[in-house]
C-alpha cells in the first residue's frame, strides 16, 4: 500500500513499499537518504514554484538509483525493480499522468477509481 506523504506521491510510496517486500527489507528502513531528497524538493518549491512539492514516481526511482551507489539496501531494492512487472495495483484516485506512465513502464496491471486526487484541477499560471 502507499499514500501521499509530505515527500512523495502515493504511487512512489507504494512502489518503494513493494520493493521492500520483494527485497525482504524491513518496512521502517529508509532506502533513500533525506540528503538526496531535500535538494530535489527545494528545487521544486523554490525554483519551480510548486506550492505542494511532492516527488513523483520517476523522481523517487532516480533518487533510489543515486542512493544505490552508497546504500547496499537501496541497491538490493533497485535490483528487484523488474519483479514489479505483472503486479496488480489499484489506486483510489486517478494517478498523475507522469506516475501513470511510469507505472505502465514498470509493467503494473493498474486500475484506478474515477476520482481525482484533488479538487484543485486548475493551476492558474
Residue spans of the language-model regions?
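Short, basic/aromatic recognition patches
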Residues: 1
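C-terminal binding/interaction regions
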Residues: 36-125
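A short, polar/charged loop-to-alpha-helix boundary motif
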Residues: 5-24
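Flexible, glycine/charged-enriched surface loops at secondary-structure junctions
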Residues: 26-34, 88
Amino acid at each position: 500500500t502507499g499514500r501521499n506523504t509530505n515527500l512523495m506521491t502515493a504511487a512512489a510510496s507504494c512502489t518503494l513499499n513493494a520493493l521492500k517486500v520483494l527485497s525482504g527489507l524491513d518496512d521502517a528502513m529508509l532506502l533513500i537518504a533525506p540528503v538526496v531528497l531535500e535538494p530535489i524538493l527545494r528545487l521544486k518549491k523554490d525554483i519551480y514554484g510548486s506550492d505542494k512539492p511532492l516527488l513523483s514516481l520517476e523522481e523517487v526511482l532516480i533518487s533510489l538509483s543515486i542512493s544505490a551507489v552508497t546504500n547496499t539496501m537501496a541497491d538490493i531494492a533497485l535490483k528487484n525493480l523488474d519483479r514489479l512487472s505483472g503486479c496488480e495495483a489499484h489506486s483510489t484516485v486517478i494517478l498523475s499522468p507522469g506516475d501513470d506512465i511510469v507505472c505502465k513502464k514498470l509493467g503494473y496491471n493498474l486500475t484506478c477509481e474515477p476520482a481525482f486526487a484533488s479538487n484543485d484541477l486548475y493551476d492558474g499560471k
